Amino acid sequence: MANGNASSDGPGNPLAAVVSTTGGVMGGAPSSAVSTYVKLVLLGLIICISLVGNLVVSLLVLRDRALHKAPYYFLLDLCLADTIRSAVCFPFVLVSIKNGSAWTYSVLSCKVVAFMAVLFCFHAAFMLFCISVTRYMAIAHHRFYSKRMTFWTCVAVVCMVWTLSVAMAFPPVFDVGTYKFIREEDQCIFEHRYFKANDTLGFMLMLAVLILATHVVYMKLLLFEYKHRKMKPVQMVPAISQNWTFHGPGATGQAAANWIAGFGRGPMPPTLLGIRQNLHNQNRRLLGMEEFKAEKQLGRMFYVITLFFLVLWSPYIVACYWRVFVKACTIPHRYLSTTVWMSFAQAGVNPIICFFLNKDLKKGLLAHLPPCCRTPPQLPREPYCVM
Protein backbone atom coordinates (compact mmCIF):
# COMPACT_ATOMS: atom_id res chain seq x y z
CA MET A 1 0.00 0.00 0.00
CA ALA A 2 2.81 2.32 0.78
CA ASN A 3 4.44 1.54 -2.50
CA GLY A 4 1.14 2.01 -4.26
CA ASN A 5 0.57 5.40 -2.70
CA ALA A 6 4.09 6.48 -3.44
CA SER A 7 3.77 5.44 -7.06
CA SER A 8 0.41 7.13 -7.45
CA ASP A 9 1.70 10.41 -6.01
CA GLY A 10 5.03 10.36 -7.84
CA PRO A 11 6.15 12.71 -10.56
CA GLY A 12 5.18 10.28 -13.28
CA ASN A 13 1.52 10.37 -12.38
CA PRO A 14 -0.54 12.02 -15.21
CA LEU A 15 -2.91 13.58 -12.67
CA ALA A 16 -0.02 15.35 -10.96
CA ALA A 17 1.21 16.62 -14.32
CA VAL A 18 -2.22 18.01 -15.16
CA VAL A 19 -2.50 19.69 -11.77
CA SER A 20 0.97 21.25 -12.09
CA THR A 21 0.25 22.45 -15.63
CA THR A 22 -3.08 23.93 -14.57
CA GLY A 23 -1.43 25.68 -11.68
CA GLY A 24 1.19 27.13 -14.03
CA VAL A 25 -1.45 28.38 -16.42
CA MET A 26 -3.49 29.88 -13.62
CA GLY A 27 -0.38 31.55 -12.26
CA GLY A 28 0.66 32.89 -15.67
CA ALA A 29 -2.78 34.14 -16.70
CA PRO A 30 -2.86 37.21 -14.40
CA SER A 31 0.61 38.30 -15.51
CA SER A 32 -0.41 37.94 -19.16
CA ALA A 33 -3.56 39.98 -18.54
CA VAL A 34 -1.58 42.69 -16.76
CA SER A 35 0.95 42.78 -19.62
CA THR A 36 -1.85 43.13 -22.17
CA TYR A 37 -3.49 45.90 -20.14
CA VAL A 38 -0.20 47.81 -19.80
CA LYS A 39 0.46 47.50 -23.54
CA LEU A 40 -3.01 48.80 -24.40
CA VAL A 41 -2.71 51.75 -22.02
CA LEU A 42 0.78 52.72 -23.20
CA LEU A 43 -0.06 52.46 -26.89
CA GLY A 44 -3.29 54.40 -26.39
CA LEU A 45 -1.35 57.13 -24.60
CA ILE A 46 1.24 57.21 -27.41
CA ILE A 47 -1.52 57.52 -30.02
CA CYS A 48 -3.22 60.39 -28.18
CA ILE A 49 0.01 62.33 -27.58
CA SER A 50 1.17 61.81 -31.15
CA LEU A 51 -2.12 62.85 -32.76
CA VAL A 52 -2.69 65.90 -30.57
CA GLY A 53 0.93 67.10 -30.54
CA ASN A 54 1.64 66.65 -34.24
CA LEU A 55 -1.66 68.20 -35.28
CA VAL A 56 -1.07 71.22 -33.03
CA VAL A 57 2.42 71.76 -34.47
CA SER A 58 1.09 71.38 -38.01
CA LEU A 59 -1.70 73.92 -37.43
CA LEU A 60 0.72 76.41 -35.88
CA VAL A 61 3.07 76.15 -38.86
CA LEU A 62 0.21 76.53 -41.35
CA ARG A 63 -1.46 79.51 -39.63
CA ASP A 64 1.56 81.57 -38.61
CA ARG A 65 3.13 83.36 -41.57
CA ALA A 66 6.32 83.94 -39.61
CA LEU A 67 6.85 80.17 -39.64
CA HIS A 68 6.54 79.83 -43.40
CA LYS A 69 10.23 78.98 -43.80
CA ALA A 70 12.19 76.01 -45.07
CA PRO A 71 12.92 74.30 -41.71
CA TYR A 72 9.30 74.57 -40.60
CA TYR A 73 8.09 73.10 -43.90
CA PHE A 74 10.28 70.06 -43.21
CA LEU A 75 8.99 69.92 -39.64
CA LEU A 76 5.44 70.04 -40.99
CA ASP A 77 6.20 67.05 -43.21
CA LEU A 78 7.60 65.09 -40.26
CA CYS A 79 4.56 65.88 -38.12
CA LEU A 80 2.07 64.90 -40.82
CA ALA A 81 3.91 61.60 -41.39
CA ASP A 82 3.85 60.80 -37.67
CA THR A 83 0.15 61.70 -37.56
CA ILE A 84 -0.68 59.28 -40.38
CA ARG A 85 1.46 56.58 -38.76
CA SER A 86 -0.34 56.98 -35.44
CA ALA A 87 -3.79 57.08 -37.03
CA VAL A 88 -3.32 54.18 -39.49
CA CYS A 89 -0.71 51.73 -38.19
CA PHE A 90 -1.08 51.86 -34.41
CA PRO A 91 -4.83 51.01 -34.21
CA PHE A 92 -4.10 47.65 -35.89
CA VAL A 93 -1.51 46.97 -33.19
CA LEU A 94 -4.14 47.74 -30.55
CA VAL A 95 -6.56 45.27 -32.13
CA SER A 96 -3.90 42.55 -32.40
CA ILE A 97 -2.97 42.96 -28.71
CA LYS A 98 -6.64 42.84 -27.72
CA ASN A 99 -7.08 39.61 -29.72
CA GLY A 100 -4.19 37.89 -27.96
CA SER A 101 -1.34 38.85 -30.33
CA ALA A 102 -3.18 37.56 -33.40
CA TRP A 103 -3.90 39.12 -36.81
CA THR A 104 -7.58 38.82 -37.65
CA TYR A 105 -7.53 40.55 -41.03
CA SER A 106 -6.45 39.46 -44.50
CA VAL A 107 -2.90 38.87 -45.68
CA LEU A 108 -3.14 41.81 -48.10
CA SER A 109 -4.11 44.21 -45.32
CA CYS A 110 -1.13 42.98 -43.29
CA LYS A 111 1.18 43.75 -46.21
CA VAL A 112 -0.31 47.23 -46.57
CA VAL A 113 0.14 48.03 -42.88
CA ALA A 114 3.69 46.65 -42.90
CA PHE A 115 4.50 48.66 -46.02
CA MET A 116 3.28 51.86 -44.36
CA ALA A 117 5.24 51.14 -41.17
CA VAL A 118 8.49 50.65 -43.11
CA LEU A 119 7.65 53.64 -45.33
CA PHE A 120 7.32 56.03 -42.38
CA CYS A 121 10.50 54.71 -40.78
CA PHE A 122 12.59 55.37 -43.89
CA HIS A 123 10.79 58.66 -44.49
CA ALA A 124 11.85 59.94 -41.07
CA ALA A 125 15.44 58.81 -41.68
CA PHE A 126 15.67 60.44 -45.13
CA MET A 127 13.99 63.65 -43.97
CA LEU A 128 16.24 64.02 -40.94
CA PHE A 129 19.26 63.60 -43.19
CA CYS A 130 18.02 66.31 -45.58
CA ILE A 131 17.29 68.60 -42.63
CA SER A 132 20.85 68.14 -41.34
CA VAL A 133 22.25 69.13 -44.74
CA THR A 134 20.05 72.24 -44.91
CA ARG A 135 21.03 73.20 -41.34
CA TYR A 136 24.69 73.04 -42.32
CA MET A 137 24.05 75.14 -45.44
CA ALA A 138 22.04 77.69 -43.45
CA ILE A 139 25.03 78.46 -41.23
CA ALA A 140 28.09 77.66 -43.34
CA HIS A 141 26.71 78.91 -46.70
CA HIS A 142 23.96 81.29 -45.69
CA ARG A 143 23.94 83.39 -48.87
CA PHE A 144 23.44 80.34 -51.09
CA TYR A 145 20.87 78.94 -48.65
CA SER A 146 18.82 82.16 -48.51
CA LYS A 147 18.71 82.41 -52.31
CA ARG A 148 18.07 78.77 -53.22
CA MET A 149 15.97 77.41 -50.36
CA THR A 150 12.60 78.67 -51.57
CA PHE A 151 9.15 77.16 -51.12
CA TRP A 152 9.39 75.14 -54.32
CA THR A 153 12.82 73.87 -53.37
CA CYS A 154 11.32 72.58 -50.13
CA VAL A 155 8.51 70.92 -52.10
CA ALA A 156 11.10 69.24 -54.33
CA VAL A 157 13.04 67.99 -51.29
CA VAL A 158 9.88 66.61 -49.68
CA CYS A 159 8.87 64.85 -52.92
CA MET A 160 12.36 63.39 -53.25
CA VAL A 161 12.23 62.07 -49.68
CA TRP A 162 8.87 60.40 -50.22
CA THR A 163 10.05 58.90 -53.52
CA LEU A 164 13.15 57.40 -51.91
CA SER A 165 11.08 56.08 -49.02
CA VAL A 166 8.61 54.38 -51.36
CA ALA A 167 11.52 52.93 -53.35
CA MET A 168 12.90 51.38 -50.16
CA ALA A 169 9.59 50.09 -48.76
CA PHE A 170 7.80 48.91 -51.92
CA PRO A 171 9.96 46.00 -53.25
CA PRO A 172 9.30 43.67 -50.27
CA VAL A 173 5.58 43.78 -51.11
CA PHE A 174 6.21 41.37 -54.01
CA ASP A 175 8.51 39.08 -52.03
CA VAL A 176 6.79 36.04 -50.57
CA GLY A 177 6.70 36.10 -46.78
CA THR A 178 8.73 39.30 -46.34
CA TYR A 179 5.92 41.45 -44.93
CA LYS A 180 4.06 39.38 -42.35
CA PHE A 181 2.60 39.50 -38.86
CA ILE A 182 5.25 39.04 -36.16
CA ARG A 183 3.56 37.65 -33.06
CA GLU A 184 6.38 38.68 -30.72
CA GLU A 185 6.05 42.31 -31.89
CA ASP A 186 2.24 42.42 -32.16
CA GLN A 187 2.49 44.09 -35.56
CA CYS A 188 2.82 43.53 -39.28
CA ILE A 189 6.37 44.47 -40.22
CA PHE A 190 9.37 43.44 -42.28
CA GLU A 191 10.37 39.92 -41.27
CA HIS A 192 14.04 40.07 -40.36
CA ARG A 193 15.64 36.71 -41.00
CA TYR A 194 19.13 35.33 -41.53
CA PHE A 195 20.92 37.43 -44.16
CA LYS A 196 21.12 34.48 -46.59
CA ALA A 197 17.34 33.98 -46.46
CA ASN A 198 16.15 37.39 -47.73
CA ASP A 199 17.28 40.97 -48.40
CA THR A 200 16.87 42.24 -44.85
CA LEU A 201 20.59 43.04 -44.53
CA GLY A 202 20.42 45.62 -47.33
CA PHE A 203 17.50 47.43 -45.71
CA MET A 204 19.15 47.50 -42.30
CA LEU A 205 22.46 48.73 -43.75
CA MET A 206 20.66 51.52 -45.61
CA LEU A 207 18.93 52.66 -42.42
CA ALA A 208 22.16 52.54 -40.42
CA VAL A 209 24.06 54.50 -43.09
CA LEU A 210 21.37 57.21 -43.13
CA ILE A 211 21.47 57.63 -39.35
CA LEU A 212 25.27 57.67 -39.32
CA ALA A 213 25.47 60.19 -42.19
CA THR A 214 23.00 62.49 -40.42
CA HIS A 215 25.12 62.59 -37.28
CA VAL A 216 28.29 63.13 -39.34
CA VAL A 217 26.72 66.25 -40.90
CA TYR A 218 25.78 67.57 -37.47
CA MET A 219 29.30 66.91 -36.19
CA LYS A 220 30.66 68.86 -39.17
CA LEU A 221 28.28 71.71 -38.34
CA LEU A 222 29.44 71.66 -34.72
CA LEU A 223 33.07 71.88 -35.82
CA PHE A 224 32.23 74.81 -38.10
CA GLU A 225 30.56 76.67 -35.24
CA TYR A 226 33.51 75.89 -32.97
CA LYS A 227 36.00 77.30 -35.47
CA HIS A 228 33.94 80.48 -35.96
CA ARG A 229 32.96 80.95 -32.33
CA LYS A 230 35.20 84.04 -31.94
CA MET A 231 35.00 87.29 -33.91
CA LYS A 232 38.07 88.38 -35.79
CA PRO A 233 39.86 91.34 -34.19
CA VAL A 234 39.41 94.71 -35.82
CA GLN A 235 42.44 95.71 -37.84
CA MET A 236 43.01 99.46 -37.52
CA VAL A 237 44.30 101.04 -40.70
CA PRO A 238 46.31 104.19 -40.00
CA ALA A 239 45.34 107.41 -41.72
CA ILE A 240 47.69 109.20 -44.09
CA SER A 241 48.80 112.77 -43.38
CA GLN A 242 51.34 115.21 -44.84
CA ASN A 243 50.19 118.48 -43.27
CA TRP A 244 47.78 117.47 -40.48
CA THR A 245 44.95 116.73 -42.93
CA PHE A 246 44.42 113.03 -42.32
CA HIS A 247 42.93 111.05 -45.12
CA GLY A 248 42.70 107.46 -46.21
CA PRO A 249 40.82 104.37 -44.90
CA GLY A 250 41.72 105.14 -41.27
CA ALA A 251 40.68 108.80 -41.30
CA THR A 252 38.21 109.94 -38.64
CA GLY A 253 36.50 113.18 -37.65
CA GLN A 254 39.71 114.39 -36.00
CA ALA A 255 41.00 115.47 -39.42
CA ALA A 256 38.11 117.94 -39.82
CA ALA A 257 38.68 119.27 -36.32
CA ASN A 258 42.37 119.85 -37.08
CA TRP A 259 41.50 121.63 -40.33
CA ILE A 260 38.98 123.91 -38.58
CA ALA A 261 41.51 124.71 -35.84
CA GLY A 262 43.93 126.01 -38.45
CA PHE A 263 46.25 123.06 -38.82
CA GLY A 264 47.02 122.30 -42.41
CA ARG A 265 46.06 123.98 -45.61
CA GLY A 266 44.08 122.97 -48.62
CA PRO A 267 40.59 121.61 -49.15
CA MET A 268 38.40 119.93 -46.56
CA PRO A 269 39.70 116.38 -45.94
CA PRO A 270 37.45 113.37 -46.67
CA THR A 271 36.75 112.63 -43.01
CA LEU A 272 34.10 109.93 -43.48
CA LEU A 273 36.10 107.71 -45.79
CA GLY A 274 37.02 105.29 -43.04
CA ILE A 275 33.42 105.03 -41.83
CA ARG A 276 32.22 104.20 -45.32
CA GLN A 277 34.82 101.49 -45.52
CA ASN A 278 33.61 99.95 -42.25
CA LEU A 279 30.01 99.98 -43.42
CA HIS A 280 31.08 98.25 -46.60
CA ASN A 281 32.76 95.53 -44.58
CA GLN A 282 29.64 95.06 -42.49
CA ASN A 283 27.48 94.61 -45.57
CA ARG A 284 29.75 91.84 -46.72
CA ARG A 285 28.87 89.68 -43.70
CA LEU A 286 26.95 86.58 -44.71
CA LEU A 287 25.08 86.01 -41.46
CA GLY A 288 24.10 88.51 -38.78
CA MET A 289 24.19 87.72 -35.10
CA GLU A 290 20.39 87.52 -34.73
CA GLU A 291 20.08 85.31 -37.78
CA PHE A 292 22.93 83.15 -36.52
CA LYS A 293 21.20 82.67 -33.16
CA ALA A 294 17.92 81.74 -34.86
CA GLU A 295 19.58 79.24 -37.19
CA LYS A 296 21.57 77.80 -34.31
CA GLN A 297 18.39 77.37 -32.27
CA LEU A 298 16.70 75.52 -35.13
CA GLY A 299 19.77 73.36 -35.62
CA ARG A 300 19.77 72.44 -31.92
CA MET A 301 16.09 71.50 -32.05
CA PHE A 302 16.47 69.29 -35.11
CA TYR A 303 19.57 67.63 -33.71
CA VAL A 304 17.69 66.72 -30.52
CA ILE A 305 14.92 65.25 -32.71
CA THR A 306 17.55 63.24 -34.59
CA LEU A 307 19.16 62.13 -31.35
CA PHE A 308 15.85 60.90 -29.95
CA PHE A 309 15.20 59.06 -33.23
CA LEU A 310 18.52 57.27 -32.76
CA VAL A 311 17.93 56.50 -29.08
CA LEU A 312 14.39 55.18 -29.58
CA TRP A 313 15.11 53.15 -32.71
CA SER A 314 18.62 51.82 -31.98
CA PRO A 315 17.50 49.00 -29.58
CA TYR A 316 15.11 47.68 -32.24
CA ILE A 317 17.80 48.00 -34.91
CA VAL A 318 20.16 46.00 -32.68
CA ALA A 319 17.50 43.28 -32.37
CA CYS A 320 17.10 43.26 -36.16
CA TYR A 321 20.86 42.87 -36.69
CA TRP A 322 20.80 40.12 -34.09
CA ARG A 323 18.29 38.22 -36.23
CA VAL A 324 20.24 38.93 -39.40
CA PHE A 325 23.67 37.70 -38.33
CA VAL A 326 22.76 34.99 -35.79
CA LYS A 327 21.03 32.02 -37.34
CA ALA A 328 18.07 30.61 -35.41
CA CYS A 329 18.49 33.14 -32.60
CA THR A 330 16.05 33.64 -29.74
CA ILE A 331 15.63 37.23 -28.57
CA PRO A 332 14.24 37.71 -25.05
CA HIS A 333 10.56 38.58 -25.29
CA ARG A 334 10.76 41.39 -22.74
CA TYR A 335 13.65 43.07 -24.58
CA LEU A 336 11.88 42.79 -27.94
CA SER A 337 8.63 44.20 -26.56
CA THR A 338 10.49 47.12 -25.00
CA THR A 339 12.29 47.95 -28.24
CA VAL A 340 9.07 47.82 -30.26
CA TRP A 341 7.30 50.16 -27.83
CA MET A 342 10.27 52.54 -27.89
CA SER A 343 9.97 52.74 -31.69
CA PHE A 344 6.26 53.47 -31.28
CA ALA A 345 7.01 56.27 -28.80
CA GLN A 346 9.14 58.05 -31.39
CA ALA A 347 5.95 59.15 -33.17
CA GLY A 348 4.92 61.31 -30.20
CA VAL A 349 8.27 62.72 -29.10
CA ASN A 350 8.83 65.35 -31.80
CA PRO A 351 6.07 67.80 -30.72
CA ILE A 352 7.29 67.73 -27.11
CA ILE A 353 10.84 68.54 -28.25
CA CYS A 354 9.58 71.35 -30.48
CA PHE A 355 7.61 73.07 -27.72
CA PHE A 356 10.50 72.80 -25.29
CA LEU A 357 13.28 74.03 -27.60
CA ASN A 358 11.56 76.37 -30.06
CA LYS A 359 10.49 79.79 -28.78
CA ASP A 360 8.44 80.65 -31.88
CA LEU A 361 6.29 77.53 -31.59
CA LYS A 362 5.91 78.06 -27.86
CA LYS A 363 4.76 81.67 -28.40
CA GLY A 364 2.32 80.57 -31.07
CA LEU A 365 0.89 77.90 -28.78
CA LEU A 366 0.49 80.33 -25.87
CA ALA A 367 -1.14 82.90 -28.15
CA HIS A 368 -3.88 80.42 -29.15
CA LEU A 369 -4.59 79.23 -25.62
CA PRO A 370 -7.66 80.62 -23.78
CA PRO A 371 -6.96 83.50 -21.39
CA CYS A 372 -7.53 81.32 -18.33
CA CYS A 373 -4.69 78.99 -19.34
CA ARG A 374 -2.13 81.68 -20.09
CA THR A 375 0.53 82.65 -17.61
CA PRO A 376 0.40 86.37 -16.73
CA PRO A 377 3.39 88.34 -18.01
CA GLN A 378 5.88 89.44 -15.42
CA LEU A 379 5.94 93.22 -15.04
CA PRO A 380 9.33 94.91 -14.66
CA ARG A 381 10.15 95.82 -11.11
CA GLU A 382 10.77 99.51 -10.51
CA PRO A 383 13.24 100.65 -7.88
CA TYR A 384 11.73 102.25 -4.81
CA CYS A 385 13.00 103.84 -1.65
CA VAL A 386 11.79 103.04 1.84
CA MET A 387 11.46 106.23 3.94
Curated annotation (Swiss-Prot):
The keyword Flavoprotein does not apply. One of its GO terms (cellular component) is plasma membrane. It comes from the Eukaryota. InterPro entries: GPCR_Orphan/Phoenixin (IPR051509), GPCR_Rhodpsn (IPR000276), GPCR_Rhodpsn_7TM (IPR017452). The chain crosses the membrane at residues 41-61, 88-108, 112-132, 154-174, 203-223, 302-322, 336-356. Disulfide bonds join C110-C188. SUPFAM superfamilies: Family A G protein-coupled receptor-like. Glycans are attached at N5, N198. It is a multi-pass membrane protein. GO terms for molecular function: G protein-coupled receptor activity. Keywords: Cell membrane, Disulfide bond, G-protein coupled receptor, Glycoprotein, Membrane, Receptor, Transducer, Transmembrane, Transmembrane helix. Residues 62-87, 133-153, 224-301, 357-387 are cytoplasmic. It is found in: Cell membrane. The keyword Cytoplasm does not apply. Residues 1-40, 109-111, 175-202, 323-335 are extracellular. It holds the Pfam family 7tm_1. PANTHER family: G PROTEIN-COUPLED RECEPTOR, G-PROTEIN COUPLED RECEPTOR 173-RELATED. Belongs to the G-protein coupled receptor 1 family. Is a receptor for the SMIM20 derived peptides Phoenixin-14 and Phoenixin-20. It mediates the Phoenixin-14 and Phoenixin-20 augmentation of gonadotropin-releasing hormone (GNRH) signaling in the hypothalamus and pituitary gland. In the ovary, it mediates the effects of Phoenixin-14 and Phoenixin-20 induced granulosa cell proliferation during follicular growth. This is Probable G-protein coupled receptor 173. It comes from Danio rerio. The lineage of its organism: Eukaryota, Metazoa, Chordata, Craniata, Vertebrata. The gene is gpr173.
